[in-house]
């Protein structure tokens, strides 16, 4: 099976920008680049093996098909839904946040 295309939503891209800004400001360029590399590895894994993500929050939030996958060495989770022809990335959130509250945040904010 060939990898599916990863399509992050606008809010997911903002999450990434915020995380990179945080690492640049508080931990330096090396940490920020490491975050980007970890996200790229997570995306590649999800593209090839979308069913391996955890469905935990799908049940908690009543969002069928929602899965999450952790970034290695960074405390972030990628939240996504597998579609027929792509992976729909909803959010990239710090694992210590109130995930249900952040997932309910409207897309336009």
Task: List where the protein language model places each region.
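Basic, Lys/Arg-enriched alpha-helical interface segments
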Residues: 1-66, 100, 108-109
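Enriched for short, Lys/Arg-rich terminal
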Residues: 71-109
């Amino acid at each position: 099976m060939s990898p599916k295309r990863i399509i992050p939503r606008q809010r997911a891209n903002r999450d990434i920008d915020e995380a990179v800004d945080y690492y640049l400001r508080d931990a330096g360029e090396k940490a920020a680049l490491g975050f980007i590399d970890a996200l790229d590895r997570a995306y590649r894994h999800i593209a090839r093996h979308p069913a391996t993500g955890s469905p935990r929050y799908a049940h908690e939030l009543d969002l069928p098909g929602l899965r999450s996958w952790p970034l290695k060495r960074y405390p972030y989770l990628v939240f996504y839904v597998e579609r027929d022809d792509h992976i729909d990335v909803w959010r990239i959130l710090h694992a210590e946040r109130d995930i249900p509250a952040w997932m309910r945040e409207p897309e336009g904010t």
